[in-house]
Curated annotation (Swiss-Prot):
Record-stated family: Belongs to the alanine racemase family.
Species of provenance: Schizosaccharomyces pombe (strain 972 / ATCC 24843) (Fission yeast)
BP-aspect Gene Ontology terms: alanine metabolic process
Identification of the protein by name: Putative alanine racemase 2
Cofactor(s) essential for the protein: pyridoxal 5'-phosphate
Key word Isomerase present: yes
Enzyme's top EC category: isomerase
S-S bonds: none
GO cellular component: cytosol
Modified residues (N6-(pyridoxal phosphate)lysine): 38
HAMAP family registered for this protein in UniProt: Ala_racemase (MF_01201)
Active-site residues (renumbered): 38, 266
Alphabetized GO MF terms: alanine racemase activity; pyridoxal phosphate binding
EC nos: 5.1.1.1
Length: 370
């Protein structure tokens, strides 16, 4: 078997969930957490993560991007609330599935609103009514929001309304004024209306709970131990560190002696500066590993060593000259140790950590520890 695999620590996800819950309880103990599982739970396996959170953390609900993601969870036995974060894309087919499987939906535009109100649902649906408070992506304007709310409030298709928005700069403390501006817009447009408030993302629990009161908090990256802040941000520290849930690993497929001044890999993007031992690792961009620059660290036999040359589709090369007794079959950690985070790896590429971790392909099997 090829050595590439992603090891998912479900206990770490549980720890991160409980940390978010603990932070919420300090300021807003009545708030609920909506766990975001879109993009296969940020590459961690949506079904397995949902089953774990439902069973061991009593998670109240999950958010996904599409009807396909929602069906995967429901058909695996998940009975918790499942919210379609973008609502529905087509009308008849999706609305019938929403009705059949009791999904909650987001409504963010006039076309969705009309289709929803005209559909003959057998049972009413929970609606998250989206306000565009300054993200300028999805949602009704502040001027029209109250009217849309009133249309839905007593409609036969609606079991309940959650008022929702999304903050554009919550992960960048230097942009705190814009986040406050969005909150004031949201509060003015929706705060006077009954029903709960909802916002994303989870980083709100770090620095905003004294200012922003939410009944539902949508959180994704923090569940998986990813740094919720922009990499360049001067961010406050969490009272306890998050634990990364994924360790990406593979194995050495061969070790080669390469003389000084020899090119490594396609295009000779690296040339040896000494007589070297080069390890070839069974992972590449076909697995979703990013095209990192020379010098990106990996860990082998407990030591950090650099990548050399371009990442190929199925392989990459590392310089193991200074690591004794490296041999075929030795494990290599690409990210996930406390000493090597995906955030550090991302600084050697043109992708951010979320792009990288959700980009792993089906060639990388997920293995779970608990």
């Amino acid at each position: 078997m090829r050595g590439a695999r992603a090891v998912i620590d479900l206990r770490a996800i549980g720890y991160n969930y409980n940390l978010i819950r603990e932070l919420l309880d300090e300021k807003n103990p009545d708030a609920h957490i909506l766990c975001i599982l879109k993009a296969n739970a940020y590459g961690h396996g949506a079904v397995e993560v949902a089953q774990f959170l439902a069973k061991y953390c009593s998670a109240e609900g999950f958010g996904v991007a599409s009807i396909e993601e929602a069906l995967e969870l429901r058909l695996s036995g998940i009975q918790n609330r499942i919210l379609l974060l973008e609502g529905f894309f087509t009308d008849e087919d999706e609305l019938s599935l929403i009705d059949k499987y009791n999904f909650s939906i987001t409504i963010h535009c006039e076309e969705q609103l009309k289709s929803f109100m005209n559909y003959p649902f057998k049972k009413p649906v929970e609606v998250h009514l989206k306000l565009d408070s300054g993200m300028n992506r999805l949602g009704f304007t502040p001027a029209e929001y109250a009217d849309k709310y009133r249309l839905l409030k007593n409609h036969k298709n609606v079991s309940g309304i959650v008022k929702a928005t999304h903050f554009a700069f919550a992960d960048i403390p230097e942009k705190s004024e814009y986040t406050l501006k969005q909150w004031r817009i949201f509060e003015k447009a929706a705060g006077c209306l009954p029903d709960p408030l909802s916002a994303g993302g989870g980083v709100i629990v770090v620095g905003w709970l004294n200012t922003i009161h939410m009944d539902w908090l949508r959180t994704g990256s923090m569940l998986y131990g990813l740094d919720p802040y922009d990499l360049d941000a001067k961010a406050p520290e969490l009272p306890k560190p998050l634990i990364p849930a994924m360790k990406l690993m593979s194995t050495i497929v061969c070790v080669k002696h390469v003389e000084k001044d020899q090119p490594i890999g396609y295009g000779g993007a690296y040339v040896t500066t000494r007589d070297s031992l080069i390890g070839v690792v069974a992972i590449g961009y076909g697995d979703g590993f990013p095209q990192v620059r020379n010098g990106c660290p990996v860990i082998i036999n407990g030591k950090r060593v650099p990548t050399v040359g371009k990442v190929c589709m199925d392989m990459l090369a590392i310089d193991v000259t200074d690591v004794p007794d490296v041999k075929r079959g030795d494990d290599v950690v690409l990210w996930g140790n406390p000493e090597l985070t995906i955030e550090e790896v991302s600084t050697f590429s043109n992708e951010n950590p979320f792009e990288i971790i959700t980009g792993l392909t089906r060639r990388v099997p997920l293995q779970y520890t608990f």
